[in-house]
C-alpha cells in the first residue's frame, strides 16, 4: 500500500521533513517513489505540489494522519490568505 508520509531530514535538534510517497512497509527514511513537498516545523512553512499530490492519490496513495492534518491546516491557511489578499496562495504554486 502506498502512503504519503513525512521523511525526516535536517540537523540534530533542527528537524525538517519532506513529504514523500513511499510503500507503507518501508522504513521512515528509506526508499521513496516521489517527493511531493516539504514541511519545516520551526519556521511553520510548508510547500505541497498539488498536481503530484492529486496524481498519487488517484493512484491509491493515502496520506498518514499527520500528513492529512498538515494538508488540512495548510489548505485552510492558504484559503484565508487568498481570501484576504484576493490572489492565489503562494504555498500552492
Curated annotation (Swiss-Prot):
InterPro entries: Ribosomal_bS16, Ribosomal_bS16_dom_sf. GO terms for molecular function: structural constituent of ribosome. Gene3D superfamilies: 3.30.1320.10. Coiled coil: none annotated. One of its GO terms (cellular component) is cytoplasm. It holds the Pfam family Ribosomal_S16. The keyword Ribonucleoprotein applies. GO terms for biological process: translation. Keywords: Ribonucleoprotein, Ribosomal protein. Belongs to the bacterial ribosomal protein bS16 family. This is Small ribosomal subunit protein bS16. It comes from Tremblaya princeps.
